[in-house]
Amino acid sequence: MTYYYGTSKSDLKDLKTTSMENGRIYLTTNRMCALVNAAKTYIDLFINKNFDYKEYTYFNICENLFEKIYKDKIGYIYSIEANENDFYCDAPDGIKPIMDSYYTLKDVTFTKKEKVNIYEEFLKLKERGIFSITEKNNIPKKYLEDTKRYYNNKYNNNYMTKDEINFFNKYIPDLLDLKWIYN
């Protein structure tokens, strides 16, 4: 079985259980989930459409946000071929695990590294009909309001790093109706 790990880090060779908080190394059997992980930023706008992790949409909360963030972003998808008996699932029997995620209690040495252009990879998935971009006027108003409230609360309670604040100032100032200044 192939297991994937998506990240922005270009220099991974392995993952050690001793460096993980709970001694578990989580990988996914779903390449698209690994791609979503490689695309992570300070705001997660990838929405799993059917709770089966086979189709995603991206909530484009500001005009051209997806393109602005990901146009030249590079990610890496690492993989290994491994015995299914070496991996476990947190989900109860008969329930599909979140993001097709499985864990091992053994160190992992990757056998393959794939450098991907995040934007181009998602456009390929869009052509196949398993990825879409939902424009702001089609996003539920409650989602936009809740997102705005969440990030404003995070900022107002000093839970944002300087890098997060700079990210929001650069890409999403319209969503939050304010220009944050790092204190």
What name fits each language-model region?
Residues 35, 40-183:
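Conserved NAD+-utilizing ADP-ribose enzyme module
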